[in-house]
Every structure is written in structure tokens, then in C-alpha cells.
């Protein structure tokens, strides 16, 4: 169990009540991954929702540029101290939509996906809070992706003429 005072430090949990934080703390475990370690790939079963205590993680997708060519890893986001990742743990079909690769030694607070979903079903108010926080994460990631896409489209348009 992680101390509630530590959970309060994360933006993901900032709107949670004291009781909700206690419930989250009861599920929380600590986890560490070394620099260079792949945590998961796109399509893997989403086993946990993570909060980054320390370190840096690249969220990436693979882009296939043609047959016979190796896939290109495209960075979608970089997750650092205080941020969250692994929202797929609470959103069907419960598979990660991006890969995760630690670029620093990284310490996490992890919430087991099955236990977390059971808690969300049991406590609807907590489930609502979690989904609000997840929605913010998805919205931010979508905004970052749009900016990247617009930048690439803008460059391709400029170079075509």
C-alpha cells in the first residue's frame, strides 16, 4: 500500500476525495523498470494503470513504410515524473494502444487493472473520478498527436509545391 500523501502529489488524482485516495492507495504497488527496458507493446493486455514517480518513458507506435522495410518507431508522447500512462487498463478492450519504453530508470505506482475495474464497479463515484482523469489524459494525448500530424502535413504540403 502506498501512502495517501504520495498519491496526492499526482495531477491524475488531484480531484479525488480523501476516501477515494485511501481506496486507490489500497490497490497501489511500487514497480521499477530500467533504462532501455520495453514495458509493453501496442496490443498487449493492459495489466496496469501507472503513475510515474521518477524517470522518463517514451510512448511510441510503429509506422510501416512498406513491405520488406523495418517499422519506424514514432514517438507519440514522453511521460515524466508526476504523469500517468496506461489508461487502457480501464477502457475496453483493455489493450495498450501504444508501446512504452523507459529511457531512464523509472519508478512507478501501479494499479492492477482487474482490481481497479472491480473497485470502479463497486464505487461508482470513484469510477467516475477515474474516468474523468483518464479522459483528460486521452484529450491531452490527442492534442499532442494532432500537433504532430499538422506539423507533418504542413511540411509535406510545403515540400510538394
Model regions and ranges:
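Cytosolic regulatory regions built on CNB/CRP/Popeye-like sensor folds
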Residues: 1-161
Amino acid at each position: 500500500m502506498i501512502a495517501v500523501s504520495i498519491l496526492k502529489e499526482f495531477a491524475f488524482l488531484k480531484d479525488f476525495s480523501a476516501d477515494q485516495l485511501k481506496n486507490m492507495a489500497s490497490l497501489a504497488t511500487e514497480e521499477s523498470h530500467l533504462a532501455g527496458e520495453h514495458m509493453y507493446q501496442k496490443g498487449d493486455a493492459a495489466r496496469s494503470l501507472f503513475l510515474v514517480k521518477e524517470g522518463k518513458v517514451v510512448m511510441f507506435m510503429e509506422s510501416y513504410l512498406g513491405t520488406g522495410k523495418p517499422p519506424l518507431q514514432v514517438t507519440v508522447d514522453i511521460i515524466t515524473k508526476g504523469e500517468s500512462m496506461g489508461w487502457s487498463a480501464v477502457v475496453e478492450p483493455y489493450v495498450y494502444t501504444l508501446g512504452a519504453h523507459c529511457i531512464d530508470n523509472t519508478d512507478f505506482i501501479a494499479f492492477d487493472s482487474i482490481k481497479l475495474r472491480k473497485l470502479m464497479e463497486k464505487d461508482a463515484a470513484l469510477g467516475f473520478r477515474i474516468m474523468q482523469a483518464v479522459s483528460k489524459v486521452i484529450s491531452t494525448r490527442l492534442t499532442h498527436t494532432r500537433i504532430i500530424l499538422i506539423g507533418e502535413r504542413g511540411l509535406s504540403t510545403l515540400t510538394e509545391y
